[in-house]
Every structure is written in C-alpha cells, then in structure tokens.
Amino acid sequence: MQNFEVIIGIEVHTALNTKTKMFSNAATSHKSIPNTLINEIDLALPGTLPTVNQEVVHKGLFLANALHMRTNHQFIAFDRKHYYYLDLPKGYQITQNYFPIGQNGYIQIIDEYNNLKRIRIKQIHLEEDTAKQTNIGNQIYLDYNRAGWPLIEIVSEADLRSAQETVLFLEELRKILLFNDISDAKMEDGSLRVDVNVSIRPQGAKKFGTKVEIKNINSISNVAKAIDYEIRRQLNLILLNQNVEQQTRRFDDNTNTTVFMRSKNDAINYRYIREANIAPIHLSDDYVKKMFLTKSCSINDLRQQLAQKGLVSSAIEQLLSDGPLFKAFKYVDKIVNNPLSVYKWLCLEFIGLINKNTQNIEEITPELLQKIARMILLFDQTLINGKQTKIILEKIYLTNKDPQILIKELGFEQITNENEITKLWHQILAKNQEMLLQYNERPDRVEKFFMGEIMKLTKAQANPTISFNVLKKILQK
C-alpha cells in the first residue's frame, strides 16, 4: 500500500430518540410487536397530511451546533425522494435534498499516529425512515413500526484514510449523539446505520479513484472489516491492470467480504422535488440562540473531567461509549464520592456480573444502584475486604438485599472494638516473641507478619485499619 492512498467518505443514518414519529403522532419503539405503532399517515392512506415533529427540528439544530455547523434555521424545507419499493408506502421519502439543516462542520479524532485530525462533515439532513424488511425463505415481512421514524443523515467529506480512522470517527460521532441526547445510537437496534465510500489512488495523485459504496453496515467492527476487504479487493484489481467499477456493494458478515448489489448504470433517478404539503419553517436567530443556551455537550470536556477524577484513558472511553453506564456511574459516585472505587465495583465487577446474565445496565433500578453505593462506602471504610465485597455484590444483585443485612447473614461483621483487638494482639505477640524482637531491624516485615496472624485468628473479621493502628501503638511502647 506504500504506493497507494485510500480515500474514504462515510454516510451515517441515526434514528432520533423522540417519543413520536417524524410526521405523525404514532409512538416510536424498537421493542414493540410489529405493525402496532402505525397510523394512517405512516401507511400513506389517501387524504392524510404530514405534520412536522418540532422535537425533530430541535434535535437536528442541536446536532448541527454540536458538530460546529452552519445551521439553515431561517429556511427549513423538505423534499420528496421518489422510488418505488415495498418498504415505502407513499412511493417517495420525505427528506432534505436542497436545504439540509446543517452544513460545513467537523469532528476531531486522534489518529493512529497520535495526531489531532479534523474530519470535515459536509452536511446533516432530516428525513423519515422506511419500514423494516425481513426476508425469511421466499417470504418478505414488513414492519411499519419503523416507517416514519425520524432520522438524521450525517455525510462526511472524503477525509478518512483507513479503516481505523473510520472507526475512530464513528466512535466519536456515537458519543456526540449519546451525550447530546440525539439518539441512543444502538447499532444492534438499527439506530445507527452506516454506508462507506471507498476508493484508491496512487500516492500524490489529486484525482480520486473510482468510488465503491458499501451499504447498511450494522456494527462498527464490521465497518472496519468491510473497508479492509474492499481495499484489498480494489488493490488486487489495480495490480492486475483491471478496472475498478463504480458499484454499490453490501458487507456479508458470514464471509467477511463485500458482495455486488448494482453498478453505476443501475443507479436510481430519485426525481427530487419540493414537498408541497409542508410549508417551509422560518426560525429567527433569537429563537435559535435561546435553544443553544443549553450548551451542547463537548466530549473532550467530559474526557478532561473524568481524567481529573483519576480515571485512566481506557476507563474514560468505556464510560463515554456507554451512555446508560455513564449515567449509573454518575448516580453512584454522587453518593460515594470516590470515582476510582465506583469504577472498579460498578463498571468492572458489576458489569461483568450482569453481562454473564445477559442483562444490561439500563435494566438496573436506582434502588439497586443505591445498595451498590452503600456497599462501596463500606468497602472504602475498610468495614469489608475485597473478597467479601465481591460476594456481597453478587448477593445484592441476586437477592436485592441491603449490604448491611448481607454482612450479618454472611458472618462478615468486623471486630472494631479497640479493647477487643488489643486483647487479640497481646495473645498473638505472646506466641511470637522471636518475631517481635526483630521489629527494630525489619519493622515492615514484622508488621506484615502480625497483620497476617490477626487475620488468620479472626478469619479476616478484625478491621484492618483499626488493627494496624492498635498494633503500632503497642509496638512503639
């Protein structure tokens, strides 16, 4: 690849997290029974007219602001994109072809060489989704729950140069969508769907190579696989002196290859025209300024805040990649006020526990999170040790019992009375006079030995902090 340069552009469709659809009052949900969240507008019944969902427009403007874009708020208009397919009841899709809601923005990434790189975003525009199509055998099943769901399409310039850069761009975009409450950005639910355009040109050439589009990639890992395969495929053609044809392809995750769909000659003429049933929306500068008083969430600012709390980079990226986990982390840390301890017990231990049970953090109640917070406080106060905390955490999850009750039930109550601990020390020291005589020469080794002895004697029920402080007093007399 030293003699060639890869050119990648990306188009992302993100489903907005609004309560209702884009042009009707039907509800939105990924989990409902098929064809139960529909009305006459979604089915394009005669005589129905679309009404623009105000929240969709607000989210579009808010995303444009978060992506540093110029907004077309003074003239928000819609267009018809014509094509005929089973998933499109009207025979056209309502979109924004001529006046996209946001233009000329960017996302910054740290590239593979640790350099800050700006990826330009050409535009974002609002549009409605189509019905969901499922093929089973020779049958085609359509779920119109998705028809009319509001989407934003995000179109980048061809600034990406590798699969890795593309993944970094998508991960950063996903965080912006999550933390600005635009979308849940769950690729597994179809809330984030990705098309990539890949071409290759000789190093130093100014003209782009022949572009190949790969449609509807359903996971970030598959985006990387699709790009890497397509680079190899095109490079092999070039090295064999064969032409790269302009095509639309899809990614087959069974074979990890891209598969031909159609050529440029088969390209559809969408016959865009203005949507006459929706009057243009004119928003004043003052109106939009008031909207933007709620500042868009900067992912880099969040990174800095988490770093100041002492979290390492991998922990920060885990939290920023999972909105519900970040929310749970903030909730628990507000009670505990120890970010490192909360991260260990909530984001590592507890997440590992619920993953084994195929549950996600969104299903965990505030009541259970409060109990986990109380458990972490007990650990931080050294009233339970690490081994005991792991056992209690699992019991909290399985039984929903309070940690204090579990401590009693499991026999984990600590000995904290100084007089009782002093008696135990005298008993231990009397049996270990030879070790006691070595204290002045090797204090650390002797202290470690005696702490081990009291833990053995009490089956780890002596409070370690109190025990150590009492031991120091005795040894220094």
UniProtKB/Swiss-Prot annotation:
Name the InterPro entries for this protein.
Answer: Asn/Gln-tRNA_amidoTrfase_suB/E, Asn/Gln-tRNA_Trfase_suB/E_cat, Asn/Gln_amidotransferase, Asn/Gln_tRNA_amidoTrase-B-like, GatB, GatB_Yqey_C_2, Gln-tRNA_amidoTrfase_suB_CS, Gln_synth/guanido_kin_cat_dom
Q: Does the keyword Nucleus apply?
A: no
Query: Can you name one GO molecular function term for this protein?
Result: ATP binding
Q: EC number(s)? A: 6.3.5.-
Task: Write down the chemical reaction(s) this protein catalyses.
Answer: L-glutamyl-tRNA(Gln) + L-glutamine + ATP + H2O = L-glutaminyl-tRNA(Gln) + L-glutamate + ADP + phosphate + H(+); L-aspartyl-tRNA(Asn) + L-glutamine + ATP + H2O = L-asparaginyl-tRNA(Asn) + L-glutamate + ADP + phosphate + 2 H(+)
GO BP term (any one): glutaminyl-tRNAGln biosynthesis via transamidation
Q: Which Pfam families match?
A: GatB_N (PF02934), GatB_Yqey (PF02637)
Q: What class of enzyme is it?
A: ligase
Q: Which UniProt keywords apply?
A: ATP-binding, Ligase, Nucleotide-binding, Protein biosynthesis
Q: Which SUPFAM superfamilies match?
A: GatB/YqeY motif (SSF89095), Glutamine synthetase/guanido kinase (SSF55931)
Q: How does it assemble?
A: Heterotrimer of A, B and C subunits.
Query: What is its biological role?
Result: Allows the formation of correctly charged Asn-tRNA(Asn) or Gln-tRNA(Gln) through the transamidation of misacylated Asp-tRNA(Asn) or Glu-tRNA(Gln) in organisms which lack either or both of asparaginyl-tRNA or glutaminyl-tRNA synthetases. The reaction takes place in the presence of glutamine and ATP through an activated phospho-Asp-tRNA(Asn) or phospho-Glu-tRNA(Gln).
> What is stated as this protein's family in its record?
Belongs to the GatB/GatE family. GatB subfamily.
Q: What is this protein called?
A: Aspartyl/glutamyl-tRNA(Asn/Gln) amidotransferase subunit B
What taxonomic lineage is listed for the species of origin?
Bacteria, Bacillati, Mycoplasmatota, Mycoplasmoidales, Mycoplasmoidaceae
